């Protein structure tokens, strides 16, 4: 494996249910010094907007910090359409084929407990806000989702009372 390069293999449907764990994993990997990221989507037929929002936010951070884009390896045509429709395709390099790094992937255990419902909801809210910040034309698509998630989060984490 090249120094500072990591492959994150996404298997199955990439949805909000695993979004908080993905966000935590990516934070841990960056914290360990990994700088170049390839997301192997060979085994990922579908991706929802929450998962894409997390990837887009991460792709933006990596690009701004290191001046290079994260790579999406073998995205399906549905994922490419989603990237284009939500205006975030420019944040990534896309590549078809194989890479030696992807063949060397090994499972990694996340530290800490699984994400709570509140953390999952907060992650979904932030992901959709990211998609709207990157591409303002996404606002009409996600305004109701944002409202619903914010209301749900307020029920899960009521605001703390002001300090005396």
Tell me what each language-model feature is.
Residues 55-59:
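Histidine-anchored nucleotide/phosphate-binding helix
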Residues 1-43, 60-164:
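STAS-like cytosolic regulatory interaction modules
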Residues 46:
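Residues immediately C-terminal
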């Amino acid at each position: 494996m090249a120094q500072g390069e990591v492959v994150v293999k996404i298997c199955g449907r990439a949805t909000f249910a695993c979004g908080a764990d993905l966000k935590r994993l990516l934070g841990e990997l960056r914290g360990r010094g990994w700088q170049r990221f390839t997301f192997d989507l060979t085994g990922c037929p579908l991706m929802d907007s929450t998962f894409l929002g997390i990837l887009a936010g991460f792709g933006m951070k990596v690009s701004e910090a290191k001046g290079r884009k994260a790579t999406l390896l073998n995205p399906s045509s549905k994922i490419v359409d989603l990237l284009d429709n939500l205006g975030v395709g420019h944040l990534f390099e896309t590549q078809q084929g194989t890479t030696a790094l992807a063949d060397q992937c090994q499972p990694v255990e996340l530290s800490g407990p699984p994400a709570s419902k509140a953390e999952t909801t907060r992650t979904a809210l932030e992901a959709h806000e990211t998609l709207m910040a990157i591409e303002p034309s996404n606002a009409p698509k996600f305004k109701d989702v944002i409202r619903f998630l914010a209301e749900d989060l307020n029920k899960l984490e009521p605001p703390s009372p002001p300090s005396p």
